[in-house]
Amino acid sequence: MSWFLVLKCLLTVCIISHLSVSSTESYGCIRKTCFGGRCLHNTTRSCEFSKGCFSQLQEFAVPLLLLNRRVEQRGCSEDNCTELAFSATLGIDWMFSYNHQCCYSEQCNNKPINVSPLSLQPNGVECPTCYSELGTCRPVSLKCTGAQTTCVNVTGQGIREDFIKIHAMGCATQTACNLKNVIILNNIKIDTSCVSGSPPLRYSPSLSTDQKTSSATAPTLCLLAAVLPAIMVMESFSEL
């Protein structure tokens, strides 16, 4: 075989290999962001060398305040996609659920996504619970329910608003343990650690009445501050 034919064969193999790699690593992912049922956009984005498509749903609720919000996102994963689903009950009555799913084919993230419903059935575990942006908080005992069988400690900080500094405790699923730099609500980066069983309460120094009020209302204020940029974007989009 002549050198010309050898080089031609090698070139053909290289081209086929390149096309094969491109076809497996480049595909379209649905791109959508929704807050409270209002969606900013719903398009297909080609994700070259994508690490996968993702679908994410976050839901937080404060039943005492009749507050319930859902944040849904879909798009291309910037890094290797890792699936994660967890739920937690923190503070007085603040419930949070998170579900992040991955897939690896054309528009595969167009399927409906949900979070597991929270059970009200006590499971025998009791955890210290509190929520504060003041650095310390006075925990009270919380009877855990359903799959939330571990006691979690959460620290967090705002990404765009660095004045948001969270310390919280409560009940959580096992999957909420030992999280590092997980971003929730697009604006808060959290770390978590867990303690199994029902640990004893360890009270911080007594808080003033104003501090207790701030601690009780902090979940709502902080979350509203976190999602406010998204609301403003939605409003601007609706006016176009």
Curated annotation (Swiss-Prot):
Cysteine pairs bridged by disulfides in the record: 47-76, 81-102, 103-108, 127-151, 144-171
Protein function: May play a novel role in the growth or remodeling of bone.
GO annotation, cellular component aspect: extracellular region
Domain of life: Eukaryota
The name this protein goes by in its record: Protein RoBo-1
Primary subcellular site in the record, as a coarse category: secreted
Carbohydrate-modified residues: 42, 153
Tissue: Expressed abundantly in bone, including the lengthening growth plate where cartilage is remodeled into bone.
Organism ancestry: Eukaryota, Metazoa, Chordata, Craniata, Vertebrata
Protein species of origin: Rattus norvegicus
Signal peptide extent: 1-26
Keywords: Disulfide bond, Glycoprotein, Secreted, Signal
